Design a protein with these regions (language model features):
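Short, solvent-exposed mixed-charge patches
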Residues: 121-122
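Hydrophobic core residues within well-ordered beta-strands of beta-rich domains
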Residues: 28-30, 86
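The feature marks short-to-medium sequence segments in extracytoplasmic or secretory-pathway proteins
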Residues: 23, 35-84
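Beta-strand signatures of extracellular beta-sandwich domains
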Residues: 11, 51-53, 101-103
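Short, surface-exposed ligand- or partner-binding patches at beta-edge/loop junctions that are enriched
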Residues: 87-118
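Low-complexity, acidic Ser/Thr/Pro/Gly-rich terminal tails and inter-domain linkers that flank the onset
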Residues: 1-25
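Short structured motifs
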Residues: 13-18, 71-76, 87-88
Length: 122
């Protein structure tokens, strides 16, 4: 699923089971592709508010001792120039084996009027 938010275009590429976190809990690795549609350099962290839910509950962000395959720990904070497209990977701690819902909204839009969302089986 993909769509336009206020200052960016975002695509939720995938959500796949990944390595365990530092607490040996199972995780899901979500990959986002985004384009900076502002007039200045920006990062995904500054523009987007990504959240992942399972059974209606928000999942905690995963912290890894050893980075799993395809995980780029710096991608969330890396800046893109205007018009550039990049990839962000974020891990989340799973509660069980049920599907996850990935939502991306504007960071400072509390009405959630612009939202990109998709459900993934784990």
């Amino acid at each position: 699923m993909e769509g336009d938010l206020t200052d960016m275009h975002v695509k939720i590429v995938s959500a796949v089971r990944s390595g365990n976190d530092y607490n040996n809990q199972p995780t899901v690795l979500v990959t986002y592709e985004w384009t900076n549609n502002t007039g200045k350099n920006n990062s995904f962290a500054v523009l987007a508010n990504p959240k992942v839910f399972q059974n209606g509950q928000e999942l905690d962000t995963a912290m890894y001792l050893d980075n799993p395959e395809d995980y780029d720990s710096g991608s969330y904070l890396s800046e893109l120039q205007p018009g550039a497209t990049g990839t962000v990977t974020l891990g989340y701690v799973l509660k069980d084996d049920s599907e996850v819902t990935v939502d991306v909204t504007n960071l400072l839009d509390f009405s959630d009027t612009a939202k990109v969302t998709y459900k993934f089986a784990i």
